[in-house]
Amino acid sequence: MKRIGILTSGGDAPGMNAAIRAVTKTAIHHGLEVFGIRYGFAGLVAGDFIPLTTENVDHKISEGGTFLYSARFPEFAQEEVQQKGVEQLKKHGIDAVIVIGGDGSYHGALALTRHGVNSVGLPGTIDNDIPYTDYTIGFDSACRTAMDAIDKIRDTASSHHRVFVVNVMGRECGDIAMRVGVASGADAIVIPERPYDVKEIAETIKRGFADGKDHGIIVLAEGVMDAEEFKDELLKYGDFDARANVLAHMQRGGSPTVEDRVNATKMGNYAVNLLLDGKGGLAVGMENGKLNTHDILDLFDSKHQGDFSLLDVNEEMTKD
């Protein structure tokens, strides 16, 4: 193996640049050439490759987003499109590829491996919804951004004795909502994985006001329902002022946290060493603080298990 490629695919996440940097510097240390593939699998098929050096990745560690850019490219599920991508890799002399992204990106990495190009997947998504890993690159930064926003929302909520339903990202995974909800002292956390009772949540809010509290915060995972709809349901059971706030894509931006920089660096370094050992079709993860690998194929038949103890802790402190 003399030359490897790296791409980012799907939604961007803080820490992706740190992973690209780690891959590049580790590979160069081992005498390999590194090419960045811009715009994900779309760029792979188009042959949009750029050489990466220590000099052009070193200052990227503190930057959010991905300087290789990203794009969703569902066409890569087609066999003939995959073959075009493989032909581009052969044309550029690239022997293996590291893919950073979510579950859709892993399908692409597996396809490349099946076509004879060893590929390793790194979990890059703020949603933290990848099986067999406790952590995905960007999750901690997204939580910090959401928590900072909710801290500011609380200021205005308190000024007006108002309730805010704050919608956070995560798709069908409630990990951001649970972590941010606990960190921001939410009165209720609502996630797709657990049943909820809007009337009971309204009673919790009313009880808080009766006890002298001057605001209410409900953290709502996006996979549950629209924030405005939830607010309207809530107001059926309570005579209080309420607003809905959707944090949306701001959670993907910003400089990555220490945790995201360190873990992305460890994962990028590990991925290169896997390729040097001739391994492919693997997904890198982290469980109990330690790096692991699983066959990518296993991920498609599994579901991420969140830390629901956070929800239990919050409910014990807020319910009667």
Swiss-Prot record:
Substrate binds at T125, I126, D127, R162, M169, G170, R171, E222, R243, H249, M250, Q251, R252. InterPro entries: ATP_PFK, ATP_PFK_prok-type, PFKA_ATP_prok, Phosphofructokinase_CS, Phosphofructokinase_dom, PKF_sf. The active site is at D127 (proton acceptor). ADP binds at R21, A22, V23, T24, K25, R154, G185, A186, D187, K213, D214, H215. Mg(2+) binds at D103. Its EC number is 2.7.1.11. The keyword Zinc does not apply. Allosterically activated by ADP and other diphosphonucleosides, and allosterically inhibited by phosphoenolpyruvate. CDD domains: Bacterial_PFK. Its main location: cytoplasm. GO terms for cellular component: 6-phosphofructokinase complex. Its cofactor is Mg(2+). ATP binds at G11, R72, F73, G102, D103, G104, S105. NCBIfam families: PFKA_ATP, PRK03202.1. Belongs to the phosphofructokinase type A (PFKA) family. ATP-dependent PFK group I subfamily. Prokaryotic clade 'B1' sub-subfamily. This is ATP-dependent 6-phosphofructokinase. It comes from Lactobacillus acidophilus (strain ATCC 700396 / NCK56 / N2 / NCFM).
